[in-house]
């Protein structure tokens, strides 16, 4: 299970994403990568979702595709890890990115 600091960092990154502060999200997630091995399955899904959607918003399609594919895999392993709205956006974005390749 992730430590409280990792959970706090993930919540902070989520709040920054909601505020469209994408560069700040990337900074938080870069720090959170140090705790990556300790993240739980649902936290991994959220981590990769935020990483992928942030990369997408910052016009980094290769990184977005990679991270969203990892998020989709994590969400299949932990079905309740992402909200239905997040899953719908994840799969729409994956399709869009794949179509542009």
Segment roles from a protein language model:
Residues 2-24, 33-36:
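Bacterial Sec signal peptide processing site at the extreme N-terminus
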Residues 7, 46, 82-86:
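Residue register of alpha-helical TPR repeats
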Residues 11, 49-50, 86-93:
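"A position-specific structural signal for the A-helix of alpha-solenoid helical repeats
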Residues 13-16, 45, 52:
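Conserved small-residue packing positions in alpha-helical repeats and bundles
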Residues 24-26, 64:
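Solenoid-repeat scaffolds in large eukaryotic assemblies
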Residues 35-36, 74-75, 82:
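Alpha-helical junction/boundary sensor with strong preference for TPR arrays
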Residues 53-65, 89-101:
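Alpha-helical linker/edge segments of TPR/alpha-solenoid repeat scaffolds
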Residues 59-79:
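TPR/TPR-like (Sel1-like) alpha-helical repeat modules
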């Amino acid at each position: 299970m992730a430590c409280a600091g990792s959970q706090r960092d993930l919540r902070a990154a989520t709040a920054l994403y909601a505020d469209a502060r994408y560069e700040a999200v990337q900074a938080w997630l870069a720090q959170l990568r140090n705790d990556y091995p300790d993240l739980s399955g649902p936290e991994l899904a959220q981590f990769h979702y935020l990483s992928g959607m942030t990369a997408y918003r910052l016009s980094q399609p290769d990184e977005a595709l990679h991270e969203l594919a990892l998020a989709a895999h994590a969400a299949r392993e932990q079905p309740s890890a992402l909200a239905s709205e997040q899953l719908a956006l994840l799969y729409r974005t994956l399709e869009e990115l794949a179509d542009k390749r």
